[in-house]
A protein has these predicted regions:
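Acidic, low-complexity central loop/insert segments
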Residues: 2-11, 51-146
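Short, conserved charged micro-motifs
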Residues: 16-21, 71-75, 104-107, 127-132, ...
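Short amphipathic beta-strand starts and helix->beta connectors
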Residues: 40-52, 83, 104-110, 184, ...
Length: 267
C-alpha cells in the first residue's frame, strides 16, 4: 500500500450532490452505484481538461479525489455553478488516499474503490495505514494504465481524447451536457483528434518538467511531443507520458531533450 500525498479528497453531500456532479463532469455519474468509482474530467467550456478526478460514491455522498495542486481551484470554480442546487462540498483535510494492488485484502478503517477501466485500486481513509511502497512505483503503474493527474502546467491544455481519458472510462458520449461537451463530442465524431497519448521510455534518468517539449525520432524524422507526466524508477529507467502526433505505425527509437539524446527502451 502506498500513500499518495499528491492527491487530495473532497466530499460532496446534499440531495443534489449526484445531479450536480452529473451536470459538471464528463463521466456518467448517474449510473455510479454506492461503493463504486469512476474517473471523470472537469473540462473548460473549450473542452480542455482542467483536472482528472476520481469520483467515489458512498451512499448518497461522493468522495472526489484530484491533484492537490488543482483541487482547491476546481472546487472554487464549481462553487460558481451551485446556484439553487442543494449541494455542499469541501476538501477533507483528515482524509488520505492510498494506492493498493487490486488483489490486496481489504484494509481496516477505510473504503476501497476500484475503477472498472483500470487495474488499480484506491483506499480512502481518515485512519492511519501501514504504507510500504514509493509514490514513484505507484506512478509507474498509473502511467501504464493511462492515468495522469495533470498539474497547473498541463491543466487546460488538452481535450480528454488527447490524454486517452476516454479509454479509462472518464468520458461518456451518451450522457447529457457538461462544460465542453459539444467540443469533446465533435472531436470524436469528426475524427479531429490528431494527437494522442504516447508512452516513451528510456533506460537513463531523464528529468523533464510537465508541459515541456521533447523530440522523438519516428520513422527517421524528429517530431515534437509534450510531456504531461514522468517518473524515474531506480534500476529501471524513465517513463514519460507524452501527447504526440498520432502515428500508430511509428514507434519512437530515440528521445531528445536539450543536450540529452537517448535510445528508447521498454519499461
Amino acid at each position: 500500500m502506498i500513500e499518495l500525498s499528491f492527491l487530495s479528497v473532497a466530499r460532496f453531500s446534499g440531495p443534489d450532490a449526484g445531479s450536480f456532479l452529473q451536470a459538471q463532469l464528463s463521466a456518467d455519474i448517474a449510473v455510479l452505484a454506492s461503493g463504486k468509482a469512476a474517473f471523470a474530467c472537469y473540462c473548460s467550456p473549450r473542452g480542455q481538461v482542467i483536472s482528472l478526478l476520481l469520483v467515489c460514491r458512498e451512499g448518497d455522498e461522493y468522495l472526489v479525489a484530484g491533484a492537490s495542486a488543482l483541487l482547491p481551484a476546481v472546487l472554487r470554480r464549481l462553487g460558481m455553478f451551485v446556484l439553487r442546487s442543494k449541494v455542499e462540498f469541501a476538501i477533507q483535510s483528515g482524509m488520505k488516499i492510498f494506492g493498493q494492488a487490486v488483489e490486496d485484502p481489504p484494509s481496516i478503517g477505510g473504503s476501497v474503490f476500484k475503477p472498472e477501466a483500470v487495474g488499480l485500486a484506491y483506499l480512502l481513509s481518515d485512519q492511519p495505514q501501514l504504507a510500504n511502497g514509493s509514490e514513484d512505483d505507484w506512478k509507474l503503474m498509473e502511467l501504464n494504465n493511462n492515468v495522469t493527474w495533470l498539474e497547473p502546467a498541463t491543466s487546460e491544455k488538452f481535450i480528454p481524447q488527447m490524454l486517452g481519458f476516454d479509454n479509462i472510462g472518464a468520458v461518456s458520449f451518451s450522457k447529457g451536457c457538461y462544460p465542453g461537451q459539444e467540443i469533446v463530442a465533435r472531436a470524436r465524431y469528426l475524427g479531429k483528434v490528431k494527437r494522442k497519448p504516447l508512452l516513451v521510455a528510456t533506460a537513463q534518468e531523464l528529468w523533464v518538467e510537465p508541459g515541456q517539449t521533447i523530440e522523438l525520432l519516428r520513422a527517421e524524422q524528429w517530431t515534437a511531443a509534450t510531456v504531461v507526466d514522468s517518473v524515474f524508477v531506480r534500476d529501471t529507467g524513465t517513463l514519460l507520458f507524452t501527447v504526440a502526433p498520432e502515428k500508430p505505425e511509428d514507434t519512437p527509437s530515440r528521445v531528445r531533450y536539450g543536450a540529452h539524446d537517448y535510445l528508447c527502451a521498454t519499461i
